[in-house]
Amino acid sequence: MRWFADPTVGAVAGNAKVGNRINMITRWQALEYVTSQNLERRALAALGCITVVPGAIGAWKREALERLGGFPLDTLAEDQDLTIAMLTAGYTVLYDSSAIGWTEAPDTVEGLIKQRFRWAYGTLQCLWKYRTG
């Protein structure tokens, strides 16, 4: 893992793509992953503030992960939680567009709503957990 030769790097986000493009719902998500998630991640990487290393395609430096106590169990968005913990601890989080991981997207409206509710609720949990002041 070339990225982890740098002692400041704690995690690397990869390029998540939808593999099951089987209907309008999954095709829409495939487009969304390209435009929203991956373009946004490139911009956040340029600013040095990636907020989520996706569970589908992410690499974590073992020493950093152990220092932070492993994967958190108290939020629904453990990937986002751990990413924020890495940044808070002073680690750098990078993005590698050539590291591609295929994920299975929800293929029903009900499944999509459940996923997005989980993501939104998990984000709110992380905001509360890492609030300051």
Placement of each model-derived feature along the sequence:
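Short secondary-structure boundary/hinge segments and terminal tails
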Residues: I22, A46, T83, T103-A105
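Long helical/loop segments within the catalytic core of UDP-sugar-dependent glycosyltransferases
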Residues: M1-L76, I113, F117-W128
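Catalytic donor-sugar/metal-binding loop of nucleotide-sugar-dependent glycosyltransferases
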Residues: D74, T83-G101
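Short amphipathic alpha-helical segments at helix-loop
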Residues: L44-G48, S97, T108
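Internal amphipathic alpha-helical segments of the cytochrome P450 catalytic fold
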Residues: I25, T83, V93, V109-E110
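Hydrophobic helical membrane-anchoring modules
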Residues: K129-G133
